[in-house]
Amino acid sequence: MAVQRTFSIIKPDAVAKNVIGEITTRFEKAGLRVVASKMVQLSEREAAGFYAEHSERGFFKDLVAFMTSGPVIVQVLEGEDAVLKNRELMGATNPKEAAPGTIRADFAVSIDENAVHGSDSEASAAREIAYFFSATELCARIR
């Protein structure tokens, strides 16, 4: 198994519910280390740019509106097989289909307000991390 970095967003619905700490604790208990984290209020331009791959899909405008409706936490997580581990912790995109005990099953209310975003591949992680963080903002976590 290789040490990887992945990208995570704690979305506006979860921030509004004050479950930032509970979600981050789940990452850490699963062996993922936070190597960068910040709270940001996305502009329409930033949200549209981040989700540009979905720009032709019917839900794009609603997604951008939701992601700009309140602050989010953007994080870089590091650990063994971080991309897959984060995806497993999040659960299915639709919280009604998410396994019990996953972040989305516990904190999300709908497929639209589904608490978290996580990279789906190492390539996506690299692109998403670079979208929000400079190399100097990523901290080595040796211990």
Curated annotation (Swiss-Prot):
ATP binds at residues 11, 59, 87, 93, 104, 114. It holds the Pfam family NDK. This is Nucleoside diphosphate kinase. Its cofactor is Mg(2+). Major role in the synthesis of nucleoside triphosphates other than ATP. The ATP gamma phosphate is transferred to the NDP beta phosphate via a ping-pong mechanism, using a phosphorylated active-site intermediate. One of its GO terms (molecular function) is ATP binding. It is an enzyme of class 2 (transferase). Its EC number is 2.7.4.6. InterPro entries: NDK-like_dom, NDK-like_dom_sf, Nucleoside_diP_kinase, Nucleoside_diP_kinase_AS. It catalyses: a 2'-deoxyribonucleoside 5'-diphosphate + ATP = a 2'-deoxyribonucleoside 5'-triphosphate + ADP; a ribonucleoside 5'-diphosphate + ATP = a ribonucleoside 5'-triphosphate + ADP. Keywords: ATP-binding, Cytoplasm, Kinase, Magnesium, Metal-binding, Nucleotide metabolism, Nucleotide-binding, Phosphoprotein, Transferase. It comes from Ectopseudomonas mendocina (strain ymp) (Pseudomonas mendocina). It is found in: Cytoplasm. GO terms for biological process: CTP biosynthetic process; GTP biosynthetic process; UTP biosynthetic process. The active site is at residue 117. Homotetramer. Belongs to the NDK family. PANTHER family: NUCLEOSIDE DIPHOSPHATE KINASE, NUCLEOSIDE DIPHOSPHATE KINASE DDB_G0292928-RELATED. One of its GO terms (cellular component) is cytoplasm. It comes from the Bacteria.
